A protein has these predicted regions:
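Expand to "…catalyze enediolate/carbanion chemistry for C-C bond making/breaking, isomerization
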Residues: 1-295
Length: 295
Protein backbone atom coordinates (compact mmCIF):
# COMPACT_ATOMS: atom_id res chain seq x y z
CA UNK A 1 0.00 0.00 0.00
CA UNK A 2 1.22 3.50 -0.84
CA UNK A 3 2.62 5.46 2.11
CA UNK A 4 0.63 8.65 2.65
CA UNK A 5 2.67 11.76 3.37
CA UNK A 6 -0.03 14.39 2.98
CA UNK A 7 0.87 16.00 6.28
CA UNK A 8 4.13 16.14 8.21
CA UNK A 9 3.52 17.79 11.58
CA UNK A 10 6.36 19.62 13.35
CA UNK A 11 6.51 18.80 17.07
CA UNK A 12 9.08 20.65 19.23
CA UNK A 13 11.43 18.14 20.81
CA UNK A 14 11.28 19.98 24.12
CA UNK A 15 7.48 19.71 24.42
CA UNK A 16 6.80 16.51 26.37
CA UNK A 17 3.02 16.79 26.15
CA UNK A 18 3.04 17.16 22.37
CA UNK A 19 5.46 14.25 22.01
CA UNK A 20 3.03 12.10 23.97
CA UNK A 21 -0.09 13.26 22.13
CA UNK A 22 1.41 13.37 18.62
CA UNK A 23 -0.40 10.27 17.27
CA UNK A 24 -3.74 11.88 18.12
CA UNK A 25 -3.24 14.83 15.75
CA UNK A 26 -4.17 12.87 12.61
CA UNK A 27 -1.04 13.65 10.59
CA UNK A 28 0.44 11.02 8.31
CA UNK A 29 3.94 11.79 9.60
CA UNK A 30 5.07 13.33 12.88
CA UNK A 31 8.37 15.20 12.84
CA UNK A 32 10.04 15.68 16.21
CA UNK A 33 12.26 18.73 15.92
CA UNK A 34 15.63 18.87 17.65
CA UNK A 35 16.91 21.78 15.57
CA UNK A 36 15.41 25.28 15.27
CA UNK A 37 12.60 24.93 17.83
CA UNK A 38 15.03 23.85 20.57
CA UNK A 39 17.33 26.32 22.32
CA UNK A 40 21.02 25.51 22.81
CA UNK A 41 20.59 24.89 26.51
CA UNK A 42 17.74 22.43 25.84
CA UNK A 43 19.49 20.33 23.15
CA UNK A 44 20.65 17.50 25.42
CA UNK A 45 17.39 17.31 27.36
CA UNK A 46 15.28 17.35 24.19
CA UNK A 47 17.38 14.61 22.60
CA UNK A 48 16.84 12.40 25.65
CA UNK A 49 13.14 13.25 25.68
CA UNK A 50 12.64 12.32 22.01
CA UNK A 51 14.61 9.09 22.54
CA UNK A 52 12.38 8.22 25.50
CA UNK A 53 9.20 9.06 23.57
CA UNK A 54 10.17 6.88 20.59
CA UNK A 55 10.97 3.98 22.91
CA UNK A 56 7.89 4.39 25.12
CA UNK A 57 4.84 5.68 23.25
CA UNK A 58 2.86 3.91 20.52
CA UNK A 59 3.53 5.61 17.19
CA UNK A 60 2.52 2.64 15.05
CA UNK A 61 -0.26 4.64 13.38
CA UNK A 62 2.09 7.33 12.05
CA UNK A 63 5.48 7.67 10.39
CA UNK A 64 8.04 9.03 12.85
CA UNK A 65 10.55 11.58 11.60
CA UNK A 66 13.20 13.45 13.58
CA UNK A 67 14.80 16.64 12.33
CA UNK A 68 18.33 16.48 13.70
CA UNK A 69 20.90 19.21 14.10
CA UNK A 70 23.76 19.67 11.67
CA UNK A 71 27.21 18.18 12.18
CA UNK A 72 28.46 21.65 13.14
CA UNK A 73 26.28 21.28 16.23
CA UNK A 74 25.21 18.02 17.89
CA UNK A 75 23.89 16.20 14.84
CA UNK A 76 25.92 13.02 15.36
CA UNK A 77 24.58 12.65 18.91
CA UNK A 78 21.03 13.23 17.67
CA UNK A 79 21.39 10.60 14.96
CA UNK A 80 22.71 7.97 17.34
CA UNK A 81 19.97 8.60 19.89
CA UNK A 82 17.06 8.37 17.48
CA UNK A 83 18.42 5.44 15.44
CA UNK A 84 18.75 3.47 18.68
CA UNK A 85 15.19 4.45 19.58
CA UNK A 86 13.83 3.10 16.28
CA UNK A 87 12.86 6.26 14.39
CA UNK A 88 11.51 5.67 10.88
CA UNK A 89 13.10 8.67 9.15
CA UNK A 90 15.88 11.14 9.92
CA UNK A 91 15.38 14.56 8.34
CA UNK A 92 18.58 16.44 7.53
CA UNK A 93 18.37 20.22 7.83
CA UNK A 94 19.97 22.67 5.40
CA UNK A 95 21.12 20.05 2.90
CA UNK A 96 23.31 21.63 0.23
CA UNK A 97 25.14 18.78 -1.52
CA UNK A 98 24.94 15.06 -2.13
CA UNK A 99 27.97 14.72 0.15
CA UNK A 100 25.82 15.94 3.06
CA UNK A 101 23.59 12.92 2.51
CA UNK A 102 26.55 10.55 2.22
CA UNK A 103 28.09 11.86 5.45
CA UNK A 104 24.90 11.42 7.45
CA UNK A 105 24.24 8.00 5.97
CA UNK A 106 27.70 6.89 7.13
CA UNK A 107 26.83 7.79 10.72
CA UNK A 108 23.45 6.05 10.51
CA UNK A 109 25.01 2.89 9.09
CA UNK A 110 27.72 2.85 11.75
CA UNK A 111 25.13 3.07 14.53
CA UNK A 112 23.04 0.33 12.92
CA UNK A 113 26.01 -2.03 12.53
CA UNK A 114 27.40 -1.41 16.00
CA UNK A 115 24.03 -2.14 17.59
CA UNK A 116 22.91 -5.11 15.44
CA UNK A 117 20.15 -3.07 13.82
CA UNK A 118 19.12 -4.06 10.31
CA UNK A 119 21.27 -1.98 7.96
CA UNK A 120 19.03 0.25 5.89
CA UNK A 121 16.11 0.22 8.33
CA UNK A 122 16.49 3.93 9.11
CA UNK A 123 15.38 6.07 6.20
CA UNK A 124 16.33 9.66 5.39
CA UNK A 125 14.74 12.88 4.18
CA UNK A 126 16.61 16.01 3.10
CA UNK A 127 15.43 19.56 3.73
CA UNK A 128 16.66 21.98 1.07
CA UNK A 129 16.88 25.53 2.39
CA UNK A 130 19.34 27.53 0.24
CA UNK A 131 20.17 28.50 -3.33
CA UNK A 132 23.04 26.01 -3.27
CA UNK A 133 20.74 23.23 -2.16
CA UNK A 134 18.10 24.05 -4.76
CA UNK A 135 20.67 24.02 -7.57
CA UNK A 136 21.98 20.66 -6.32
CA UNK A 137 18.52 19.16 -5.74
CA UNK A 138 18.87 16.53 -8.48
CA UNK A 139 22.12 15.15 -7.07
CA UNK A 140 20.80 15.32 -3.50
CA UNK A 141 17.65 13.38 -4.42
CA UNK A 142 19.70 10.54 -5.92
CA UNK A 143 22.44 10.43 -3.26
CA UNK A 144 21.14 7.47 -1.23
CA UNK A 145 18.68 4.61 -1.46
CA UNK A 146 17.63 5.52 2.08
CA UNK A 147 16.12 8.81 0.90
CA UNK A 148 12.33 8.73 0.91
CA UNK A 149 11.88 12.39 0.05
CA UNK A 150 13.16 15.93 -0.17
CA UNK A 151 11.47 18.95 1.37
CA UNK A 152 11.57 22.70 0.92
CA UNK A 153 12.50 24.83 3.92
CA UNK A 154 11.29 28.25 2.86
CA UNK A 155 12.27 30.56 5.71
CA UNK A 156 16.02 29.98 5.40
CA UNK A 157 15.71 29.83 1.61
CA UNK A 158 14.10 33.27 1.22
CA UNK A 159 16.65 34.76 3.62
CA UNK A 160 19.43 33.27 1.52
CA UNK A 161 17.77 34.73 -1.60
CA UNK A 162 17.59 38.20 0.03
CA UNK A 163 13.82 38.32 -0.05
CA UNK A 164 10.95 37.31 2.25
CA UNK A 165 7.75 35.28 2.21
CA UNK A 166 4.85 36.77 0.25
CA UNK A 167 1.19 35.67 0.28
CA UNK A 168 1.22 34.58 -3.38
CA UNK A 169 4.39 32.49 -2.98
CA UNK A 170 6.00 33.66 -6.22
CA UNK A 171 9.39 33.88 -4.49
CA UNK A 172 9.27 30.08 -4.02
CA UNK A 173 8.19 29.04 -7.52
CA UNK A 174 11.67 28.19 -8.83
CA UNK A 175 12.67 26.32 -5.66
CA UNK A 176 9.43 24.35 -5.61
CA UNK A 177 9.81 23.45 -9.27
CA UNK A 178 13.42 22.32 -8.86
CA UNK A 179 12.68 20.23 -5.77
CA UNK A 180 9.61 18.66 -7.35
CA UNK A 181 11.42 17.74 -10.57
CA UNK A 182 14.39 16.35 -8.63
CA UNK A 183 12.09 14.21 -6.50
CA UNK A 184 10.17 12.87 -9.47
CA UNK A 185 13.37 12.05 -11.38
CA UNK A 186 14.62 10.11 -8.34
CA UNK A 187 11.29 8.42 -7.64
CA UNK A 188 10.93 9.85 -4.12
CA UNK A 189 8.46 12.14 -2.34
CA UNK A 190 8.37 15.94 -2.52
CA UNK A 191 7.14 17.74 0.61
CA UNK A 192 6.28 21.43 0.61
CA UNK A 193 7.26 23.99 3.23
CA UNK A 194 5.18 25.22 6.17
CA UNK A 195 2.59 27.99 5.97
CA UNK A 196 3.31 30.05 9.05
CA UNK A 197 0.14 32.19 9.30
CA UNK A 198 -2.01 29.68 11.17
CA UNK A 199 -4.94 32.12 11.38
CA UNK A 200 -5.21 32.62 7.60
CA UNK A 201 -7.25 29.54 6.73
CA UNK A 202 -8.22 30.73 3.25
CA UNK A 203 -4.63 31.56 2.31
CA UNK A 204 -3.45 28.23 3.68
CA UNK A 205 -6.03 26.24 1.72
CA UNK A 206 -5.21 28.14 -1.47
CA UNK A 207 -1.52 27.30 -1.05
CA UNK A 208 -2.27 23.63 -0.41
CA UNK A 209 -4.40 23.44 -3.56
CA UNK A 210 -1.61 25.12 -5.51
CA UNK A 211 1.15 22.78 -4.35
CA UNK A 212 -1.09 19.77 -4.97
CA UNK A 213 -1.67 21.06 -8.50
CA UNK A 214 2.10 21.35 -8.96
CA UNK A 215 2.50 17.73 -7.91
CA UNK A 216 3.80 17.78 -4.32
CA UNK A 217 3.00 14.72 -2.21
CA UNK A 218 2.19 16.72 0.89
CA UNK A 219 2.99 19.64 3.16
CA UNK A 220 4.81 20.30 6.40
CA UNK A 221 2.49 21.81 9.01
CA UNK A 222 3.06 23.57 12.32
CA UNK A 223 -0.40 23.51 13.90
CA UNK A 224 -2.79 20.57 14.43
CA UNK A 225 -5.62 22.71 12.99
CA UNK A 226 -3.91 22.61 9.60
CA UNK A 227 -3.83 18.81 9.40
CA UNK A 228 -7.47 18.04 8.46
CA UNK A 229 -7.44 20.86 5.90
CA UNK A 230 -4.46 19.36 4.06
CA UNK A 231 -5.65 15.78 4.39
CA UNK A 232 -9.05 16.66 2.92
CA UNK A 233 -7.55 18.45 -0.10
CA UNK A 234 -5.13 15.60 -0.75
CA UNK A 235 -7.68 12.81 -0.35
CA UNK A 236 -9.34 11.85 -3.67
CA UNK A 237 -12.95 12.99 -4.03
CA UNK A 238 -15.85 10.64 -4.73
CA UNK A 239 -15.94 11.91 -8.32
CA UNK A 240 -12.22 11.18 -8.79
CA UNK A 241 -12.58 7.73 -7.23
CA UNK A 242 -15.61 6.84 -9.36
CA UNK A 243 -13.78 7.83 -12.55
CA UNK A 244 -10.68 5.89 -11.51
CA UNK A 245 -12.81 2.80 -10.83
CA UNK A 246 -14.39 3.10 -14.27
CA UNK A 247 -10.92 3.18 -15.83
CA UNK A 248 -9.85 0.08 -13.87
CA UNK A 249 -13.04 -1.74 -14.87
CA UNK A 250 -12.45 -0.79 -18.52
CA UNK A 251 -8.95 -2.29 -18.28
CA UNK A 252 -10.34 -5.53 -16.85
CA UNK A 253 -12.98 -5.71 -19.55
CA UNK A 254 -10.38 -5.24 -22.27
CA UNK A 255 -8.17 -7.91 -20.72
CA UNK A 256 -11.06 -10.38 -20.49
CA UNK A 257 -11.65 -9.91 -24.21
CA UNK A 258 -7.97 -10.24 -25.00
CA UNK A 259 -7.97 -6.73 -26.41
CA UNK A 260 -5.07 -4.32 -26.16
CA UNK A 261 -7.38 -1.39 -26.83
CA UNK A 262 -8.99 0.21 -23.78
CA UNK A 263 -11.96 2.54 -24.18
CA UNK A 264 -14.25 4.33 -21.75
CA UNK A 265 -17.42 6.14 -22.79
CA UNK A 266 -16.31 5.93 -26.40
CA UNK A 267 -12.88 7.44 -25.73
CA UNK A 268 -9.48 5.76 -25.86
CA UNK A 269 -7.77 5.25 -22.50
CA UNK A 270 -3.99 5.60 -22.81
CA UNK A 271 -1.20 4.78 -20.36
CA UNK A 272 -1.04 8.16 -18.49
CA UNK A 273 -4.79 7.97 -17.77
CA UNK A 274 -4.38 4.43 -16.47
CA UNK A 275 -1.46 5.43 -14.25
CA UNK A 276 -3.39 8.38 -12.79
CA UNK A 277 -6.38 6.15 -12.10
CA UNK A 278 -4.19 3.60 -10.35
CA UNK A 279 -2.68 6.36 -8.21
CA UNK A 280 -6.12 7.70 -7.24
CA UNK A 281 -7.15 4.18 -6.20
CA UNK A 282 -3.93 3.72 -4.21
CA UNK A 283 -4.32 7.07 -2.41
CA UNK A 284 -7.99 6.50 -1.67
CA UNK A 285 -7.26 3.04 -0.29
CA UNK A 286 -4.39 4.32 1.86
CA UNK A 287 -6.59 7.15 3.15
CA UNK A 288 -9.28 4.67 4.16
CA UNK A 289 -12.02 6.06 1.90
CA UNK A 290 -11.97 3.03 -0.42
CA UNK A 291 -11.64 -0.67 0.30
CA UNK A 292 -10.13 -3.25 -2.03
CA UNK A 293 -13.52 -4.99 -2.19
CA UNK A 294 -14.99 -1.84 -3.80
CA UNK A 295 -12.61 -1.89 -6.76
Amino acid sequence: MERLRRTMMFVPGANAAMLRDAPLFGADSIMFDLEDSVSLKEKDTSRALVHFALKTFDYSSVETVVRVNGFDSCGALDIEAVVLAGVNVIRLPKTETAQDIIDVEAVIERVERENSIEVGRTRMMAAIESAEGVLNAREIAKASKRLIGIALGAEDYVTNMKTRRYPDGQELFFARSMILHAARAAGIAAIDTVYSDVNNTEGFQNEVRMIKQLGFDGKSVINPRQIPLVNEIYTPTKKEIDHAKQVIWAIREAESKGSGVISLNGKMVDKPIVERAERVIALATAAGVLSEEDI
